[in-house]
């Protein structure tokens, strides 16, 4: 996939503007030009030989780690709203990982689609594949919040068209309205406490998940990165002779 960045070709006038800004100069930018520069395998077809030689021993070591096969995916899994195989799987892993804090899975698992950056393809799973899917240093956070705020969380998920969830079922409209929600098949009770296993990024209220800020309690075990938890899950399933799989279960149903 080609990626682009904006390259300023004519920036002299801009530099002059900053230089004289404190003097209230009459200089003004009259023209700015730029072009899109594709950044792909053709951008630098002749790598620097000296740099390559310097990096070679490090690359060999990294490659030996990144290409290590840790499991097998039963099918290809991608992300996508309102529900997807990959987001269901990762949300399940988070929910199960809450056992290290609670002694049992959380009531709900939650991961944002934006945190899943690649496809898990059918076949061998390498460490590198997991880094491609989960490149961020997100960590497990288990938050405890009242049902009234859990409903607000569901409304935010509905407004975004769906996110990765586990342990709950939502009914939403195409326009992003919440029609109904259940936790473990039961309606949400406003004053009851519920546990949500998510990542620190969302627990901080990012990606519109502001309801999580209202948590009564927040537990974030040190060193429990989402990537590490997912790696552990894959290796545990593999040791048990199982392939990595997922299912579409109608966790978020869109109704007219």
Segments from the language model and where they lie:
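Feature captures C-terminal
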Residues: 25-40, 89-91, 95-97, 103-109, ...
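Acidic/histidine-rich, surface-exposed loop or edge segments in extracytoplasmic proteins
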Residues: 64-81, 209-215
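N-terminal, Lys/Arg- and Ser/Thr-rich interaction peptides
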Residues: 47-74
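C-terminal motif of bacterial Sec signal peptides marking the signal peptidase cleavage site
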Residues: 19-22
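Bacterial N-terminal signal peptides that target proteins for export
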Residues: 2-13
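Post-signal peptide N-terminal segment of mature Sec-exported envelope proteins
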Residues: 32-54
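A conserved active-site cap/scaffold subdomain adjacent to cofactor or substrate pockets
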Residues: 84-85
């Amino acid at each position: 996939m080609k990626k682009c960045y904006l390259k300023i070709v004519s920036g002299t006038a801009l530099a002059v503007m900053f230089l004289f800004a404190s003097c209230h100069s009459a200089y003004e930018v009259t023209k700015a030009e730029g072009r899109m520069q594709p950044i792909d395998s053709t951008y630098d077809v002749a790598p620097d030989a000296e740099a390559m030689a310097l990096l070679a021993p490090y690359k060999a070591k990294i490659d030996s780690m990144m290409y290590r096969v840790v499991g097998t995916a039963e099918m290809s899994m991608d992300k996508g709203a309102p529900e997807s195989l990959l987001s269901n799987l990762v949300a399940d892993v988070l929910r199960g990982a809450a056992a290290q804090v609670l002694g049992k899975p959380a009531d709900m698992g939650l991961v944002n689609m934006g945190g899943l950056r690649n496809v898990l393809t059918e076949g061998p799973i390498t460490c590198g594949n997991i880094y491609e899917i989960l490149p961020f240093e997100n960590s497990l956070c288990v938050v405890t919040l009242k049902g009234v705020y859990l409903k607000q969380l569901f409304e935010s998920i509905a407004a975004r068209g769906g996110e990765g969830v586990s342990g709950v079922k939502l009914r939403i409209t195409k326009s992003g309205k919440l029609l109904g929600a259940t936790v473990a098949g039961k309606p949400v009770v406003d004053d009851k406490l519920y546990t949500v296993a998510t990542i620190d990024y969302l627990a901080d209220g990012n990606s519109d998940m502001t309801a999580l800020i209202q948590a009564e309690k927040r537990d974030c075990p040190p060193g429990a990165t989402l990537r590490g938890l997912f790696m552990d899950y894959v290796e545990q399933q593999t040791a048990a002779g199982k392939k990595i799989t997922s299912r579409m279960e109608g966790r978020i149903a869109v109704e007219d």
